[in-house]
């Protein structure tokens, strides 16, 4: 059978989006891996599935697969594309929608200026909820990586993140430390790794090594996690701007117990069909 799909991106973090509300198909990890190959498939960072909800209190179910076939809990840039997609496809007329993810319920708002705001919910900082192996909760942790001690913050935005502060974003050890921390045994579900350079109290630069995808042009949950880490440690103030290789996100967080708000663009690239 042929399935209609849309190619989208949020600041260069690119997605294949499938409407499984009006189309019916059983998508498996092998399909994500096959379609995700940039040489022999469609090519993307993540596959986003738009499904009818299981929960009557939400509008849609949102599932996410990495290009290696692994299913993940959350994707912030994908959430903005999800909101743009369901409105463009007339799956809803609402400008504010509630979406069920593997990592919890999020709220999406399409603003009059075309930007999309996502209420990502409160961050999780308790180690076992991230999950991260630590004796007790702290603002930062020391991690032994090949005999080198690395200082990092650990945050869950529905998916696990480690955040490291660096002095030079261009020479950050994204491709050397990134995969080692991703697979570190103290992160039992693996982890996304953010390298954060604080420019001033309102602006920072960020590069992210994404679990199962490698370095991407942008990572929405990574930007949220970096903002939480920076505000928690007194480096920055809310609201703040985070510049990623693909562009800029605005993040707001009022502190523990409060939701993280992320605002940025979502862009449709093309429509296509793929054989299942």
Swiss-Prot record:
Sorted UniProt keywords: Amino-acid biosynthesis, Cytoplasm, Isomerase, Lysine biosynthesis
GO biological process: lysine biosynthetic process via diaminopimelate
Swiss-Prot/TrEMBL site (Important for dimerization) positions: 270
Presence of keyword Ligase: no
GO molecular function: diaminopimelate epimerase activity
Residues annotated as the enzyme's active site: 75 (proton donor), 219 (proton acceptor)
Annotated GO CC locations: cytosol
Main location: cytoplasm
Residues the record lists as binding substrate: 13, 46, 66, 76-77, 159, 192, 210-211, 220-221
UniProt pathway: Amino-acid biosynthesis; L-lysine biosynthesis via DAP pathway; DL-2,6-diaminopimelate from LL-2,6-diaminopimelate: step 1/1
Catalytic activity: (2S,6S)-2,6-diaminopimelate = meso-2,6-diaminopimelate
Site entry (Could be important to modulate the pK values of the two catalytic cysteine residues), positions: 161, 210
EC number: 5.1.1.7
Organism domain of life: Bacteria
Localization of this protein: Cytoplasm
Subunit structure of this chain's protein: Homodimer.
Family classification: Belongs to the diaminopimelate epimerase family.
Function: Catalyzes the stereoinversion of LL-2,6-diaminopimelate (L,L-DAP) to meso-diaminopimelate (meso-DAP), a precursor of L-lysine and an essential component of the bacterial peptidoglycan.
Name by which UniProt lists this protein: Diaminopimelate epimerase
UniProt organism field: Pseudomonas syringae pv. tomato (strain ATCC BAA-871 / DC3000)
Species classification: Bacteria, Pseudomonadati, Pseudomonadota, Gammaproteobacteria, Pseudomonadales
